[in-house]
UniProtKB/Swiss-Prot annotation:
It comes from Chinchilla lanigera (Long-tailed chinchilla). Residues 112-145 are annotated as: Disordered. Belongs to the eukaryotic ribosomal protein eL21 family. Component of the large ribosomal subunit. The lineage of its organism: Eukaryota, Metazoa, Chordata, Craniata, Vertebrata. This is Large ribosomal subunit protein eL21.
Length: 160
């Protein structure tokens, strides 16, 4: 038997609700405010069929470019064969949530501003760039009175 070509083909688990989360959608979902330029994550909610994104956008992150009463317009990158296209989709707000991908960056910006301000008051220079983790410090290994054992590979012997 061939595969069907429906819009929701292969979404048995993708659009299903988590355990003990079936039924009415919490009101907090509708209370969230979305503005132009917000970064949002797309995640289809099976309880609401209206305004549901296509399965190919599930789990993607996009930027809000338009806001209406019940839905938002989102720009999402989608790979089509060899190229990546910026697709504009309209999705109801039940199927999106604010992304946490920028939180760490914004937190770092805030910390850097604070460091700059303190350095300016003191008249010193401060390192703002993130540094890779340095090599670990040298340390001694305790042997507890035992001599270290020298390990050597067994010499290769050809057996015919």
């Amino acid at each position: 038997m061939t595969n069907t070509k429906g819009k929701r083909r292969g979404t048995r688990y993708m659009f299903s609700r988590p355990y003990r989360k079936h039924g009415v959608v919490p009101l907090a979902t509708y209370m969230r405010i979305y503005k132009k330029g917000d970064i949002v994550d797309i995640k289809g909610m099976g309880t609401v069929q209206k305004g549901m994104p296509h399965k190919c956008y599930h789990g993607k992150t996009g930027r809000v470019y338009n806001v209406t009463q019940h839905a938002v317009g989102i720009v999402v990158n989608k790979q089509v064969k060899g190229k990546i296209l910026a697709k504009r989709i309209n999705v109801r707000i039940e199927h999106i949530k604010h992304s946490k991908s920028r939180d760490s960056f914004l937190k770092r910006v805030k910390e850097n501003d604070q460091k700059k301000k303190e350095a300016k008051e003191k008249g010193t220079w401060v390192q703002l760039k993130r540094q890779p983790a340095p090599p670990r410090e040298a340390h001694f290994v305790r042997t507890n009175g035992k001599e270290p054992e020298l390990l050597e590979p067994i010499p290769y012997e050809f057996m015919a």
